[in-house]
Structures are given as structure tokens and as C-alpha cells.
UniProtKB/Swiss-Prot annotation:
PANTHER family: SERINE/THREONINE-PROTEIN KINASE TAO (PTHR48015), SERINE_THREONINE-PROTEIN KINASE SULU (PTHR48015:SF16). Keywords: ATP-binding, Kinase, Nucleotide-binding, Transferase, Tyrosine-protein kinase. GO terms for molecular function: ATP binding; non-membrane spanning protein tyrosine kinase activity. Its EC number is 2.7.10.2. Disulfide bonds: none annotated. This is Putative tyrosine-protein kinase C03B1.5. The active site is at D155. It comes from the Eukaryota.
């Protein structure tokens, strides 16, 4: 493994200050993986400033390997996530470590640890409208925040919404995020996001903004209630089959749900983003007032985990529960 002070590439130099993670950080367990790389739970034990006691800390470390030609994508992810991180419903991102290796670069992002993981478990279980209202209320708060900053998340799917051990919903993974300035440019050259959650304007290679996230929120709501992607009509579901649904102006049925939920969905379903609700407008929907409490969804989620035999490390004995924000 090579190490250097700076990458030869141009861009955000804070990302490319080449340095490995501190030796006292101990990656303890893999808690996630995918095409991007992997996420490790890290234990950090160090003396406090007075040298009187050991501080125990836990956080997540997202490790990404990529060719150096893609460095601008990682810089965009880090910059947009960092800009948006100061909100209760956005997963906090801290310091970034980077190293070079033969095939390119390895970036290690320090992230807040969300012990209950993503919403896959909730989606695969009996989910009540009040649970989904709680999720939506928290996410809309996060979306108002990032949209006010001129950022669109771009991939509002089940895998990218996390929950902490206290039951707080967190918007995560800004890999598809970008500024309105960039996304509003028409004729984008690529379709980004998760099939089923991608807004029609993105599928049609048009310019888009924060309202694309509201389309994703509507599909996320139905996904949680139905237990699968509501656009899925057969065994195989991919981008091409989703494009067909979009070309036919299809939208999943939601007529068997309560009136407040139907009204909420109606505000998010329009194929024309001009007539689709904004995050701020959606925040006033009656449906959100039917939300369960934080303690209710936390207890429900914990019961589901016990039923499934899931036992990720539980951060109850941690003296410090924070994310490093500077290189050490």
C-alpha cells in the first residue's frame, strides 16, 4: 500500500490527503456490503485529554475502492453529504481517510453508526400506516433541509434509509446526490438511482430537482406497506421493465389504504414534477399526523429483530458515541 501527502488529481484536497486510519481504531465487524465496497463497525479506545480514563467509542467506517478516474464522483458524494450532515435525520459523516493502491484509490469514510440498519426488515414484515407515517415525517424533515441547501439526494430507497438504536430515522448514502445547478441541466446522459424509485423525469433524461426525491418517497411508502417494490409486475424487475412501466404512465394502486394516506400519495404521484408536491408542502399533509411515536416504532423494530434472530452490536455501554471529524 502506497501512502502520499496529496493525490496528483485536482479537486477537493481534503479528501486526497493520503493517510491511513489510526492504529487504535479496531474494525470489529462487517455490517454492510455492496457494489460500493463494505461498511465496518469500528471500536475506538483511547485515553481522554487528562489521561485519566479510557474513552470507548463506536462508529461506522465505509470503505470504497475505485479507479482514480472516478475520484470526482467520490468528491461529489463527500461534499454533498458533508454540506447536509448537520440535521437530526441525516446520517452524520466525519473525517475521510484515503490511500492509493495499484488499481486506484481506497477511501474510508467515518459515519454515524445506525445500529438498526436499513428499512429492509420493516419492509419484509407487517407494517402499519402509522409506522410509515413516522418514517415519512422524519424523511420529509431531512428533505426540506437538503433541498434548502440546493441538494437532491437522488436515491431515496429502502437500503438508503437507516435507523439508530434510539429509533431516529437517518437519510444516508449520498452517492447519487448532486446540486440543483447540475441536475436541472436537461438531457442528462445517464440514469442514476434504484429502479422503481427513480422519478420519471430522470428516466426521460430531463433536468430534475428536489421533487424527484418526493417521487421516491411515495414509492418508498408503498414498498414498506406492500413488502416489495410496487412497480414489480413479474419475477424479474430491473431498469428496463421499470422504463416500460414509466412509458405506460403506470402507477401502483393505493386505493385500499386510509383516506389520509391516499391524499398523501396523490400529492407525490404526478408524472409532471410541476404538479408534484415539494417536501415543504408534503410536510403539512394530514397523513403525517397519524404517525406513531418514536418509542413505538423502536419497540416494534426491536421485536422484529429478536423474532428474526438479528443481533447487531448494541451501543448501550459506550461512553462516547461520536464520529471523528478531523484526521488523527
Amino acid at each position: 500500500m502506497q501512502s502520499a501527502q496529496k493525490s496528483k488529481t485536482n479537486g477537493d484536497t481534503s479528501l486526497f490527503l493520503m493517510k491511513d486510519i489510526p492504529q487504535y481504531w479496531s474494525p470489529a465487524l462487517k455490517i454492510g456490503s455492496g457494489a460500493f465496497g463494505e461498511v465496518m463497525l469500528v471500536h475506538s479506545d483511547r485515553l481522554d485529554a487528562r489521561g485519566e480514563q479510557i474513552l470507548h467509542n463506536e462508529f461506522a467506517l465505509k470503505v470504497i475502492r475505485f479507479p482514480e478516474c472516478d475520484y470526482h464522483k467520490i468528491i461529489r458524494e463527500v461534499n454533498t453529504h458533508t454540506l447536509c450532515r448537520h440535521h437530526d435525520n441525516v446520517l452524520f459523516i466525519g473525517s475521510i481517510y484515503c490511500q492509493t493502491f495499484q488499481q486506484g484509490l481506497r477511501v474510508q469514510m467515518c459515519l454515524e453508526y445506525a445500529a438498526l440498519s436499513d428499512l429492509s426488515l420493516l419492509a419484509s414484515s407487517e407494517t402499519f400506516e402509522s409506522h410509515v407515517a413516522y418514517i415519512c415525517k422524519n424523511l420529509i424533515s431531512a428533505l426540506i433541509h437538503i433541498h434548502n441547501l440546493g441538494i437532491v439526494h437522488g436515491d431515496l430507497s429502502v437500503k438508503n434509509i437507516l435507523m439508530t438504536h434510539e429509533g431516529v430515522v437517518k437519510l444516508s448514502d449520498f452517492g447519487m446526490a448532486n446540486t440543483f445547478e447540475q441536475t436541472r441541466k436537461s438531457k442528462n446522459q445517464s440514469i442514476l438511482g434504484t429502479p422503481g424509485f427513480i422519478a420519471p423525469e430522470i428516466i426521460n433524461l430531463q433536468g430534475y430537482d428536489g421533487k424527484a426525491d418526493l417521487w421516491g418517497l411515495g414509492i418508498l411508502s408503498l414498498f414498506l406497506l406492500k413488502g416489495e417494490n410496487p412497480f414489480k409486475k413479474c419475477t424479474q424487475f430491473d431498469l428496463e421493465s421499470y422504463k416500460v412501466s414509466i412509458s405506460e404512465s403506470f402507477y401502483p394502486d393505493y386505493s385500499n389504504y386510509s383516506t389520509p394516506l391516499q391524499e398523501f400519495m396523490s400529492s407525490l404521484k404526478d408524472y409532471n414534477p410541476e404538479f408534484r408536491s415539494s417536501a415543504l408542502h408534503a410536510s403539512s399533509q394530514t397523513y403525517l399526523k397519524t404517525s406513531c411515536s418514536q418509542s413505538e416504532i423502536l419497540n416494534y423494530y426491536k421485536r422484529l429483530r429478536r423474532t428474526r434472530g438479528m443481533d447487531l452490536p448494541w451501543p448501550e455501554e459506550i461512553h462516547t458515541f461520536s464520529v471523528p471529524v478531523s484526521l488523527e
